[in-house]
Swiss-Prot record:
This is Flagellar hook-basal body complex protein FliE. It comes from the Bacteria. One of its GO terms (molecular function) is structural molecule activity. GO terms for cellular component: bacterial-type flagellum basal body. GO terms for biological process: bacterial-type flagellum-dependent cell motility. Signal peptide: none annotated. The keyword Lipid biosynthesis does not apply. Belongs to the FliE family. It comes from Pseudomonas putida (strain W619). It is found in: Bacterial flagellum basal body. Keywords: Bacterial flagellum.
């Protein structure tokens, strides 16, 4: 007889858990962006493109200086090189923070 009572209690508990689960708000998809707004992925892509452009400009300026093109100063070459270096370091730090945030989220208990 006690098995019947335990079974009924188990069924009541399961129904209560089901009702609790049904009353929880549903997970929603990412909100739609308003017109004119860009997503984080777009901003990151633009930043990567800008770093690439900075590095290309630095390389072109250095090559022009090496072949002795007139109007190219060593100071301009060094400044362009440092700009490219700093932008790459900043992008690397952003990448490191993204990886760390991803790892933190993945280690969260569910």
């Amino acid at each position: 007889m006690s098995q019947g009572v335990e079974f009924n209690r188990l069924m009541l508990d399961m129904r209560a858990m089901q009702a609790d689960a049904m009353s929880l708000p549903k997970a929603t998809a990412a909100p739609e962006l308003a017109e004119g707004q860009s997503s984080f992925a777009d901003m990151l892509g633009q930043a990567i493109g800008k770093v690439h452009q900075t590095q290309q400009a630095s390389t072109q300026l250095a090559n022009a200086f090496e072949i002795g093109k007139s109007g190219v100063d060593l100071t301009d070459v060094m400044i362009a090189s440092q700009k490219a270096s700093v932008s790459m370091q900043a992008l690397t730090q952003v990448r490191n923070k993204l990886v760390q945030a991803y790892q933190d989220i993945m280690q969260m208990p569910v």
